[in-house]
Every structure is written in C-alpha cells, then in structure tokens.
UniProtKB/Swiss-Prot annotation:
Name of the protein this chain belongs to: Bacteriochlorophyllide c C-7(1)-hydroxylase
Requisite cofactors: [4Fe-4S] cluster
Domain (Radical SAM core): residue spans on this chain: 104-359
Pathway: Porphyrin-containing compound metabolism; bacteriochlorophyll biosynthesis
Gene: bciD
Organism encoding this protein: Chlorobaculum limnaeum
Length: 402
C-alpha cells in the first residue's frame, strides 16, 4: 500500500470503466495465493480497490503477473496495480481443524459476514431481489431445509465464526461485522432477536470488549414488526443497522425487490431507518446499501438526499451483473454516468455531514463511514475521498492490511 495516497480523476474514471465495462483478464502468472476472479485489484498510487468483472467483449484488458497487474485499453497502457493484499490468517485453521476461510463466508477486505441464517425465504418462494446472487444457486429444496436449521447447529457455526473473528482481530484486522442471513423462515420471524443473540454471544465470549467496541457491528436484517426490538439487538452488542433499500423509489422497489416489498412496503423500511437513528444514532449507526444503476439518476439522487437529511448514511454500491441473478443480462451504467452520479452523491455527503454522527474528514473508525475507505464496488466513497483530499486532508489507508 502506498505511503501517501493521491487520488486523481483519472483513477476514478478508470475504476468507473472497470466497474461498467469489465475487462478481458489474462493470468500470465498466478498470484502467490492463487487467482480468484472476485478478489479486488488495486490501482497503485491511489490505492483504489476495484472489482474487475471478466468480460470478453470490452476494450479493457488486464494482465496479471503474479501479484502485479497492468491495465490496458486496446493495447495502450493505462495504469499499474496489484492484487489486493491477502490476509495470511485466512489460510489458518480453527481449533477444530476446519479452515478459517470456511467460517468467514463472503468476506472481503473490511467486512466479515456473521450468519444467523443460511437461507433467504424470498429465494425459497421465488421473490428474490432481481439483482441478488447470494442464494441464486441454492436449490429451493435445499434452501427450505437450511431455513429450518436447528438452533444448535446455528450456535455451533456461530462459535466458529466468533473464533475466526478472534483470529482476525488478534492479527490486527478492524472493519465491519455484518449480521446477515436474508429473510428468515416465517416460523422464525418472531425469534430474530434470539437469533441475533445466538450469534453475538460467542463473539462477546471470544473477543474482548475493547476490540468489539472498535468494530462496526451492523444488523443487515429485515426491519422488525416492533421497532423497539432494535433495543434488544443493541443489548446483544450491535452498534448499527443496515436496512438495505437497494433503490429509493416505491415503484422500483416493488419491481426489483418483490420479496422485500411484499414483506413491508418501502415506507415501512424508511420508518425503520428513522427509528434506528433514534436508537443507534445517525451516520455510522444507521446505514443502507443503495445500488447505483437500477433507477434513473435524478430519482436516485432525490432519494439519497432525503435519506441523508434524516441522518441515514447510504452506501452506494455500483450494480454488477452476476450469473444466477434474474437481472444478469442487464449491464451497469457507463463510466461517465457513474462518475457524474458519484460526484453528486459525494457533494450530498458533504452537504449533509452535520446530520451524521461525526465530520466526514475526522471519521477514522473502522466501518462503512471511515474516511478514505475504498471498497471494490463503491465509487462514490472514492469520489468523496478525492474531494476531501482536494480540501487539504491527507488520506489514510484505503482498507485493512494484516
């Protein structure tokens, strides 16, 4: 990682192109830890992390030479980079002999998912979010069986997850723990607080209170029927919620997230976020993923601004077509659209930063709101970092390395 990061507009535009167009990837020599197409690549100098979706019909090319990568446009060299640093502790073993990697399903550089469920009822009933791939390759019969996994088995897996987090944090990792699992089976919807406690208890036992207090621990759950239930989540050790809207307009919400919409209308999700602001606080305490590219820019920006005005911190993922998802054939927006939208979102972050719990440039806490953070499918955060850099702030590390 660079000793001093400098982000340029060219870096941002190249990342936008990679997220929009993908690239033809040639692995001349595999990285030391092996080549994984979902592992981020990093632009040297700016340390912007980006997903590089493999696409055969694009001008962009990436040459992988061990841990070094080179980016080209029809043979013209654009930039140099590297594979995102691998965590050595992920290749270790748990106390029961199982690989650490097996316990941290879906982890990326600064997020560890803590599963309280291994199946989404929307997938099991044909109502998945149309872009979602988490359970897309899970047979419905298997999903329905996993949806009723005994609590004793969930607890056993939770202990493995907690041990993996202990190994990670002992190695210096700091980031976001995401309590995740989609929509639980109808028979368990009154037991969500119990499931949260089931996975949080081993974390409290294995990880010191001092370290847990440093981490961003968020509930990527569906809103509860009674908003007061969030107080129970907080008592279990969560310090944030993440009620992901995905889109901001009711019509798009119904069309793209049929299961979410059938469970609760968009208005209820908005009310849940506002209740979270009161319980967990604004900014880092109340976040939401929104996908750039699923609705017109003006509609998205209006919705994002309204949420920020209420203290909600939107994390703007760039929509990516993923095999298995219903919307797989829909491409992302072009790079210029992404750059323009990201710049406007960054301006909104700055405009509404007094509604969050900490000034943007002073937020060095692990988590979604950390100043200078570069996440591999988020461009608006990079644009915000660029604007803060232009205001004279020195950028910290883009992501954890340990």
């Amino acid at each position: 990682m660079s000793t001093k990061r400098v982000i340029t507009k060219e870096d941002i535009h190249l990342k936008a192109r990679l997220l929009s167009e993908g690239a033809k990837v040639t692995v001349n020599k595999p990285p030391a830890s092996g080549f994984n197409p979902f592992r981020a690549m990093v632009l040297n100098g700016s340390d912007l992390a980006t997903l590089v979706r493999q696409e055969p019909y694009t001008r962009l090319e990436v040459q992988v030479n061990g841990d070094d990568v080179e980016f080209y446009d029809c043979g013209q060299h654009l930039a140099s980079g590297r594979m995102q640093e691998a965590f050595s502790w992920r290749s270790g073993k748990l106390s029961n002999g199982r690989p650490v990697d097996a316990a941290v399903i879906g982890m990326n550089q600064d997020i560890i998912n803590i599963h309280y469920s291994y199946s989404c009822d929307n997938n099991n009933t044909g109502r998945s979010c149309r872009f979602c791939f988490f359970f897309a390759d899970q047979h419905i019969g298997v999903g329905k069986e996993l949806a009723k996994m005994p609590f004793s088995k969930i607890e056993e897996l939770a202990k493995e997850q907690a041990e993996a987090v202990k190994i990670a944090t002992d190695a210096g990792w700091r980031g976001t723990l995401v309590i995740i699992g989609g929509l639980v089976d109808p028979s368990r919807r009154a037991q969500v607080a119990d499931l949260v406690e089931l996975v949080m208890a081993p974390l409290r036992e294995q990880v010191s209170p001092e370290v847990l207090n440093e981490l961003h621990i968020t509930a990527n759950l569906y809103p509860p029927d009674d908003f007061k239930e969030m107080e129970k989540w907080k008592a279990s050790g969560l310090n944030s919620t993440e009620f992901d809207l995905e889109v901001t307009h009711p019509d798009y919400f119904k069309a793209i997230c049929p299961g979410k919409s059938a469970t609760y209308p968009l208005e209820y999700w908005l009310e849940a976020q506002e209740a979270s602001v009161k319980i967990f606080g604004p900014g880092r305490g109340t976040t939401s993923f929104i996908l750039m590219g699923l609705e017109p820019m003006n509609i998205m920006l209006e919705g994002v601004e309204e949420r920020m005005s209420k203290g909600v911190y939107p994390n703007m993922l760039v929509y990516q077509p993923v095999p298995g998802a219903d919307m797989f054939r829909m491409p992302p927006p072009n790079a210029d659209w992404l750059v323009e939208a990201s710049e406007k979102v960054a301006d909104l972050y700055i405009k509404y930063q007094d509604r969050f719990d900490m000034p943007l440039a002073k937020d060095h806490r692990p988590g979604y709101t950390r100043m200078g953070r570069s996440q591999y499918i988020i461009l608006a955060g990079d644009m915000l970092a660029y604007k803060l850099q232009e205001q004279g702030y020195e950028l910290p590390e883009a992501y954890p390395v340990c």
